[in-house]
Amino acid sequence: MAKVYYDNDVNKEYLKNKKIAVLGYGSQGHAHALNLKDSGYDVVIGVREGQSRTKAEEDGFQAYDVSEAVERADVTVVLMPDEVQQRVFNEEIVPHLKPQSALVFAHGFNVHFGAIKAPDDVDVFLVAPKGPGHLVRREYVKGSAVPALFAVDQDVTGDAKALALNYAHGIGATRAGVIETTFKEETETDLFGEQAVLCGGITKLIHYGFETLTEAGYQPELAYFEVLHEMKLIVDLMYEGGMEKMRHSISNTAEFGDYVSGARVITPEVKENMKQVLADIQSGTFSRQFIEDNNNGFESFKSMRSTQAGHPIEKVGADLRMMMPFINNN
């Protein structure tokens, strides 16, 4: 079973009198920075000139270029997109890191797959909230929290685990609980979930459902409602209480259909395909593909994005959502 840590497991002295540089002020960056600041820690922002820096300054932070922020820091938190981290790390972070300082990540991608190699004289750990930045911030302000994962990759000082837990406490996560893991486990499970289920799997399932109905002569609008719009209703029930609550809440007709038809659609062959997706993640095949495409200006990525945006379900959905102002209001 997973080991879970809470507030009373944290020594809150490890971040005391340390300056924390949060690099990036996007979804996770702003949430980590504000929560740490409200927890009483000394936080500066490292970000280039632009809207993000202006927003950070409006939120009460001193903001600097990345290199200057790192020079000032005892703890450097890398919260930039995966695809830019390697360049920024090599050019603007490494030359300015203090020995015996700490490097913090919210995702292990670049460290695990070797795109980033930390110096041998710094601690390296990750703290990964299991929710988007706005939720991390909102729950903290309410006195609640989003759970998180944490892992230590390099422990030079002997204090990396204690520091990671103190950091998790600073962003509020130990209120809910933080689970100990490894960079390998966090990275590979995160990528698998995105590719096989949460993003890749579900979007392809929806497309095939929409196409099956429209090719059989049903109106696209009804197809959209049945395979995409109502997905949220089902997912919300599972989110709140697992599949048991979902099945308790739907009709007997729907539940019976779940049992007799689900395995006809998602066959054992799908599980074998999932295993191959996982194998490509584990071997580094996916990471190499992603990094190579990024180095080529994301040519393939942009082409795939354009193709998917042109699927008929997007036009049908855009029109139908005009009938549902409550969606935008929420």
Curated annotation (Swiss-Prot):
The active site is at residue 107. InterPro entries: 6-PGluconate_DH-like_C_sf, KARI, KARI_C, KARI_N, KARI_prok, NAD(P)-bd_dom_sf. The keyword Lipid biosynthesis does not apply. NADP(+) binds at residues 25-28, 48, 52, 82-85, 133. Mg(2+) 2 binds at residues 190, 226, 230. Its cofactor is Mg(2+). Binds 2 magnesium ions per subunit. It catalyses: (2R)-2,3-dihydroxy-3-methylbutanoate + NADP(+) = (2S)-2-acetolactate + NADPH + H(+); (2R,3R)-2,3-dihydroxy-3-methylpentanoate + NADP(+) = (S)-2-ethyl-2-hydroxy-3-oxobutanoate + NADPH + H(+). Involved in the biosynthesis of branched-chain amino acids (BCAA). Catalyzes an alkyl-migration followed by a ketol-acid reduction of (S)-2-acetolactate (S2AL) to yield (R)-2,3-dihydroxy-isovalerate. In the isomerase reaction, S2AL is rearranged via a Mg-dependent methyl migration to produce 3-hydroxy-3-methyl-2-ketobutyrate (HMKB). In the reductase reaction, this 2-ketoacid undergoes a metal-dependent reduction by NADPH to yield (R)-2,3-dihydroxy-isovalerate. Belongs to the ketol-acid reductoisomerase family. HAMAP family: IlvC (MF_00435). This is Ketol-acid reductoisomerase (NADP(+)). It comes from Macrococcus caseolyticus (strain JCSC5402). The lineage of its organism: Bacteria, Bacillati, Bacillota, Bacilli, Bacillales. The gene is ilvC.
